[in-house]
Amino acid sequence: MPQNLENKSGLYKTNTLGFGIAGIILFCMAYSQAPLYYSNQNQYFLHGFTKAKLGYLEKDWLGNTTDPTPLFSGLVCLSITWINENIFYLYYAMLQGVFLSCAWIIYHRKNNNKTFEIGHYALFSAIFILINSAALRWLSYRLFAQDYPWFLQAGVAGQYILGAMFQPSNFGVFLLLGLSLFLVEKHISATVFTCLAGILHTTYLLGGAFIILGFQLYLVLDGKIKKAILIGILALLLVTPSVFYAAGNFQPSSSEGFKEAQEFLVKFRLPHHCLPQLWLDWVACLQILWIMLSIFLLRKQKALTVILVPFLLGALLTLIQVATKNNTLALLFPWRISSVLVPLATMIILSEFLSYCNPFISRLKPFVPSVVLSIILALLGIAIPVFKAGFVIKENENGILAHIKTNKTIDDLYLLPVNVPNLASTTRGSLSSDFKPIGKKTTDTRIVPIDMQRFRLYAQAPLYIDFKSIPYKDADVLDWHRRLLLAQNWQKRLLDNKSPELLLEELRAQKINHIVTNANVDLEQSELELKFSDDHFKLWKIKEARNP
């Protein structure tokens, strides 16, 4: 190769790499992250923290139930033991980078793999960053009391890929990456990444199967039958261990118990995720139309099959669930494929629109304005959590949590105030609460209560039960529900101050020796010792029973 061509090739690769790294950094900053430990992290980090033997979490009941995400928990355990908790921010940023890379793959494909034009890519990236930015979402909530941009990156039923923080659902980016790679003829790597999502989080096994079937139909229609069979076999080999783990560890303990546990999950704890009659509102309908628009734009391309098949299979199983009201099917979330197809649709539609406008864009010289916009969004994305304009937590809990973290002992077990919402009657549609002010967040009956969510991970102490964090094995779900009812009953009796001696004996029988109450609660102190009090909470220690 002539020297000048080698130099141009090297410069091209350098420019592309530099643009990619800078774009990912700006996207991660603009998208933003919630502080540790936020929302679902308090459930999904627990098994990892328990395995790492942090504090006295090995004594926590929930931390010792069957783990639905063992590989994720293993990563959490290793990271918190050998590195530092801040590594979780980096893990999430890497997955955010995969998300943006998928958008670039889609845009590059639409431009027929033409020479890299930095101005065009900068404009595409800036608009994509804007759509997904924390700043736009914050502004939407302030203007309309709803986070509307969220619905361009999330699926129906309150299900999504990225969200606010590092958690198992993030691995759905590998389904998106699989689809993106297949669209540029990387069939084997597409299959591997699609399966990787299901390996890391079994909830993606069904959606992954939809996508693999779409791959196979595409290849069959393209006359590549042997390759279609090959990727089917490869996919089966890759996901078999995960399927066996799920089947072996979450098989029914008994037919009646399994049925009852599913009923609790579907109609009591997860109705906003499980019942189409609750989540199918006008926004969800628009999201479905958004997916259909992306399919329409691909109507003259063979790639149509790759997206159409998972969409139709998800829709078909959703209709079957609605018709049969089958709880098992509801808990498989066939509509969860929308959490992949909606952001993919956004990428496709944006790529198609900008490609149509290419002649006009070339005259604009958009590089500098695009970079400036991206930098502004990145700075705002950093500012939002720093100034507590989003991802807010109940900071009035910090005092009591810090006290417990410092003063806990190995025999302690804590009873917290339990707030049990009626989600089946208060939920309609889906929403993101990441940018709600704390006052509205704590009073919105559509949101799972956020009270004391951080207790286990922050204080590293075991508690008896809470509503937010749940197990998934049927026997554990039944035990969770039993504990929840007991906690509600005890809480009512504490406030009524009825038969306190009998109540305390029941608590001692469950090995509960500490009670957290609101600051305005005064309890009879003959059998209790006040260990902590501030303007928000009190901590009571149950004295040891007197010998008869």
Roles of regions detected by a PLM:
Residues 386-548:
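Extracytoplasmic
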